[in-house]
Amino acid sequence: MEAIKDFFGSLMLREMLKGMALTGRYMFSRKITVQFPEEKTPQSPRFRGLHALRRYPNGEERCIACKLCEAVCPAMAITIESEQRDDGSRRTTRYDIDLTKCIFCGFCEESCPVDSIVETHIFEYHGEKRGDLYYTKEMLLAVGDRYETEIAAARTADAAYR
């Protein structure tokens, strides 16, 4: 009979106090929740976000249609079509990235010989439909044009580590 009393006493009181002590410890510890739109956590300098295509300072697009980024992409998210110009150089007629397939590994950025495709620090983008995350050449060039100063600064800061 004594064993039954000890069992219920320890089950009800001691275990309850242990649980409340644990709850109290977490209640008064430092909170780690961030109220996202108002507060932002620091980003790594090497964060890989939204893709962008860059241009040369004279306005010409950098991509020479070598298709290395398409070949190295493990998710097969990049589609490139190109044609020959009158001067003999190659340029892209189509450069699409399907962000629903992309795993943001950065291989496309590393393989590009002319530094055309880059991954920016932008992570706040969305799509209401699946097709909204399918970026065409014009959309990627627009992102590159809009954020060129930030992209150039990030590339310069990271140049020593490449």
Curated annotation (Swiss-Prot):
One of its GO terms (biological process) is aerobic respiration. [4Fe-4S] cluster 1 binds at residues 63, 66, 69, 112. It is a peripheral membrane protein. [4Fe-4S] cluster 2 binds at residues 73, 102, 105, 108. It holds the Pfam family Fer4_7. Binds 2 [4Fe-4S] clusters per subunit. Belongs to the complex I 23 kDa subunit family. It comes from the Bacteria. The lineage of its organism: Bacteria, Pseudomonadati, Pseudomonadota, Betaproteobacteria, Burkholderiales. It is an enzyme of class 7 (translocase). It catalyses: a quinone + NADH + 5 H(+)(in) = a quinol + NAD(+) + 4 H(+)(out). Keywords: 4Fe-4S, Cell inner membrane, Cell membrane, Iron, Iron-sulfur, Membrane, Metal-binding, NAD, Quinone, Repeat, Translocase, Ubiquinone. GO terms for cellular component: plasma membrane. It comes from Herminiimonas arsenicoxydans. This is NADH-quinone oxidoreductase subunit I. The keyword Lipid metabolism does not apply. NDH-1 is composed of 14 different subunits. Subunits NuoA, H, J, K, L, M, N constitute the membrane sector of the complex. Its EC number is 7.1.1.-. It is found in: Cell inner membrane.
